Amino acid sequence: EVDLGLDEYVNGATGPVFVLGTRERAAAFLAASRHRRRIAGVVARGLPAGESVAQVARVVWPAVEDWMGRRQEEAILELEDAVGARRLAAGIDEVWSLAQDGRGDLLVVEESYALAARADGDRLERVVDPRAPGVVDDVVDEVIESVMTRGGRVAIVADGSLEERDRIALKLRY
């Protein structure tokens, strides 16, 4: 029954799924679920019925952090593989242009990276005042949106993880 309820979420969302329940119930769910590949983590702990969302979040959060750490590592490794295949763009100027063309498979960006700029087609002009007319206050956010709307994936990594790539990198589809 729970697996049926999960169908709607899994078919419409791309986010992770975490299973929370006693060891026995979590194991039974995993054995019966059609969605095992979407399960990002299991928290083997029971909670009283009617527990608050805040309490559930506190219990599940360590598993979410573990999953995010694994995703960051996987994204960095995927970028390294793309270097060998000559399918990697780095730095906001190159990434901006290729993302607009729909070539992004995986965008990896440092979590606090933001940049105000004026967009002129494929080119970006950095600005001092993010409130000036015609300025995009955060072109990094625009790149993220562009990659996602064109079916690409996005991974946010810790600051300093992409220093050699100017804080942003794009694995190309072709």
Outline where the language-model segments fall:
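Terminal alpha-helical anchor/extension segments at protein ends
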Residues: 1-174
